[in-house]
């Protein structure tokens, strides 16, 4: 594993990113993405139904804490336009009222724009970019993931919610029983510098 992967220094596919992010929605269980749910013959008889490959990789409490942090992205961060009507952009009136955890992303020189978003039973990701790294937007205003990828995710999710057969959740993420991590992003903390040298000056 390359440590710089967290900074976006390593190329990664949408499949890999969505698979990794969905681990948090799955309470710490990684489910390897699978494109085939089942194979049926012409009479509807199931010939093959691959079993999901799963692995416990993150503690449930940690996964829930990360989900709550990523909910902040859509409540008051770069993904907040999903909640309040598109941030003034025409034709992007999403106004989702349900909890959504997500993360926008923008690479060097605005070459890539990302948005990965999750609800309890669906994780989806959008990448806007070009294999030619020389192709990029001129400014972060236009090239950031919140401007390029997030609107596409919003349109996709509106269509998912419009299709009742998909049964995409609007419920809150499940809180683990016996949660041991206190998730509090609002109470200010007093920072004490233990390396400071005491003086008489105020």
Question: What label would you give each PLM region?
Answer:
Residues 11-201:
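A penicillin-recognizing enzyme superfamily signal
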Residues 1-6:
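Surface-exposed aromatic
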